[in-house]
Amino acid sequence: LIYASNKSMIAKLKGDKDSYYLSFDEIPQSVKDAMVVTEDRDFYKHEGVNFWSTAKAAVMLVESKLRHKDISRGGSTITQQLAKNVFLSNERTYERKVREIFIALDLEKKYTKDQILEFYINNIYFANGYYGIEAASRGYFNKPAKDLDLAEAVFLCSIPNRPSFYNPLEHYQNTLKRKNRILKQMLDEDCISAAEYSDANYEKIVLKPAQAIKTQN
């Protein structure tokens, strides 16, 4: 994947989200920690692809084809997810997975880990037409991401894994349960203290949703 300039690739990664695009420093630390902990704990260690996880995902893809069931989950790093979300379709084929790997490796050569995480958090889908953490924060809580507390931030970070299943407007309890699981992961990884975990775990999440842009799985 070759672009004429670094600027042109960044434009592609930002897409039409500039109005709600946050720089790395503007993204709350709780959001960055939650995304890494739940989506790709080795994000700052690998070079774009976790080949062991990818191999397991490939086996699951084969099984899903043979059984005609959707059982293929996971295996993609944050960089791979970014490659798929921005440059590829959601089809589950071997060809797409190979392209995803090569694009991810290319992204890792061109950008720092912090830049990739910034692109990812600004591009990931949060259900109900909201792309990126700023749009999600304004859409679900009617406030900018910088004003999210820990529980609210992690609640939002629970959605992208399966946007339809964790859609908080339709499956609030699913989102809440995942929020609590992610908080425990953050505690185990020393991202938060025991007191912060306890407070966020028991905090009541009150949504103040704006009108959704559109519904999309």
What do the PLM-derived regions correspond to, one by one?
Residues 1-217:
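Juxtamembrane regions of bacterial inner-membrane/periplasmic proteins
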